[in-house]
């Protein structure tokens, strides 16, 4: 189906493993766009009644079929989770090259489940996921984190999705920063990422 890979990357932070799953074309047609796809995946992967900070509550980064095209405003991705502010579904959009890079990895969505045992930097490249120690990033602002990751990897075009002290401390309205100051800024997705 044009605009989709039909693939979802699922990363289990607890076991530090990842795997790919296929998504049926009918679901891609029915739940179009990053928010629609993310909402479908949230309901599919969530445990009913779970707390937003529970390891069983997924954090989903989803793209639309237009990501990677030359269409204006097509570089948006949706971050979908349960909101720590409301306890209900939350979607937050951000526009950046992170959306394009996610699509270039060959997936339509990235699902994070579980809880990391230590501060962890996920490095996703060419369909491979590496779990790197990120203790050295703890306490840094999002701008400092992005700069430090790029310097550490010696890759100044790598895209970074980061939380700062607010997300680390589970502030219920924390954001996820990316691409030098763009944010997925609604509903506390940064706190979910920090949990």
Regions found by a protein language model. Give the residues of each.
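Active-site cavity-forming subdomains of large catalytic enzyme subunits
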Residues: 99-100, 104-195
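Pocket-edge structural micro-motifs
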Residues: 22, 61-65, 133, 164
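Short, conserved beta-strand segments within well-ordered enzyme catalytic domains
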Residues: 60-62, 78, 111, 123
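N-terminal basic/disordered segments at the start of proteins
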Residues: 1-40, 44-45
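Conserved oxyanion/phosphate-binding beta-strand-loop segments in alpha/beta enzyme cores
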Residues: 39-75
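A gly/ser-rich beta-alpha-beta helix-loop segment of oxidoreductase catalytic cores
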Residues: 68, 75-87, 91, 167-184
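Extended catalytic cores of very large enzyme megasubunits
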Residues: 3, 18, 66, 70-72, ...
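Thiamine diphosphate
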Residues: 95-96
């Amino acid at each position: 189906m044009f605009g989709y890979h039909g693939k979802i990357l699922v990363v289990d932070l607890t076991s530090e493993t990842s795997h790919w799953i296929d998504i049926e074309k009918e679901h891609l047609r029915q739940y179009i766009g990053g928010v629609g796809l993310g909402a479908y995946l949230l309901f599919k992967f969530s445990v009913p009644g779970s707390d937003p900070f529970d390891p069983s509550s997924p954090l989903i980064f989803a793209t639309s079929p237009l990501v990677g095209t030359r269409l204006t405003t097509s570089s948006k991705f949706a971050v979908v989770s349960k909101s720590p502010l409301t306890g209900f579904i939350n979607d937050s959009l951000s526009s950046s090259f992170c959306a394009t890079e996610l699509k270039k990895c060959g997936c339509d969505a990235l699902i994070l489940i579980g809880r990391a045992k230590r501060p962890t930097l996920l490095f996703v490249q060419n369909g491979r996921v590496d779990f790197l120690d990120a203790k050295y990033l703890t306490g840094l602002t999002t701008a400092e984190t992005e700069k430090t990751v790029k310097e550490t990897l010696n890759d100044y075009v790598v895209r970074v999705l980061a939380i700062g002290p607010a997300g680390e401390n589970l502030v219920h309205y924390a954001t996820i920063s990316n691409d030098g100051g763009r944010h997925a800024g609604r509903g506390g997705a940064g706190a979910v990422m920090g949990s």
